[in-house]
Structure formats: C-alpha cells, structure tokens
Amino acid sequence: MNYRQYLHPGGEPATRQRMPQLMTSWGLLYRALRRAFPPERYYEGSPLTEFSCGEFGVSVRFGAGDVQRFDLLVGADGARSFVRQQLLPEVKPRYAGYVAWRGVVPESEAGRALLRTFDDHFTFQQMHHSHILCYVIPGAAGERERGKRRLNWVWYWNVPESELFALMTGMRREIA
C-alpha cells in the first residue's frame, strides 16, 4: 500500500500523500505463526488455569491438570486476558470513548469504482463524532492477488459512556 488518503463527505478524495505501509490480517498472521509452531506444543482449546515464571522458563497448568514447562508463554487470549490479569492485576479495562464496527467485503463483490478508490490506499473519512477507515487485506485463505483480497473497514463512533448501555443493548435504563 503506497498512499494515505482522506475523502470528502461525498466520497471523492480530499487529500492524498505517498506513505508506503504494509497491511495484513489477523488470519494471515495467525496462520504464519501457527505453521512455524509444532502441533504438539500448541494447546488450542486447553484452558490455562495457572502459570509461574522462573529462572528456567514458565510452568503452565492447563484445565485438565497437566503441567508443562516452556521457554515462552504467549498470552493471546483476548480482551479479558487471563495472562494479563495475572501479570498486571492492577490494569483494568476501561472504556476508550468510542465503539467500533468492523467488516470485510470480498474484492470480487465490490464495484470497480469502489476498488479504484481503495486499491493501494489506506483511506479515511471524517464525519461528525466518527470516522471510517478502509484498506485492502489478504483474502480469507491469505490470497494477495487482486480480485481475491478483501476490503477491511472499521467505523469508529464517539459515544459518551452514559449512552453505551442503550447502544449495546437497544434498551434505555431509566433511573428514578
């Protein structure tokens, strides 16, 4: 990807500057790391219940009770990470002030005009209390050829914390 651009409200480019950068997808990164890792050392679906760091590595206990020793523990266990809670118990999640909706569209399902707008561009559009970004990522199976990739889009919307419950549930909380 060679350019960064900002769009006018009508969709036409407002500014464009050369800014080469590489984009990928979590799926492609995951598959590359997974291929490099031996299957017998990967514990998918085995809940981590305890770990301790020592001079010679990390001892890990899994849900079934088995204990293994590793040189490195990668805590890729999500937003409410057990690993992070154990290492940094004082760090608590806090609302960032916005919500985000994300989606992907196969290039093959996007119109030519849309593809011309986004191909080779990391694109932003600013709106009232929100913005959208869009860029091309590899296809579902890691394809990088034109026509087989996907358009990744994320819509960020600034929402006061007091309105978050109603937004996320469709319900309003009335406090008397």
Language model segments and positions:
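Conserved beta-strand-loop-beta-strand element in the redox core of flavoprotein oxidoreductases
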Residues: 50-68
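Flavin (primarily FAD) binding-site architecture
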Residues: 75-89, 107, 164
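Short hydrophobic core segments
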Residues: 48, 68-79, 153
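Glycine-rich loop(s) and the adjacent beta-strand/alpha-helix scaffold that form part
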Residues: 100-110
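Conserved FAD/dinucleotide-binding core of flavoprotein oxidoreductases
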Residues: 12-13, 17-20, 25-30, 64-67, ...
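Glycine-rich beta-alpha-beta "Rossmann" dinucleotide-binding loop(s) and their flanking helix/strand
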Residues: 85-100
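Active-site-adjacent segment of FAD-dependent monooxygenases/related oxidoreductases
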Residues: 1-39, 43-52
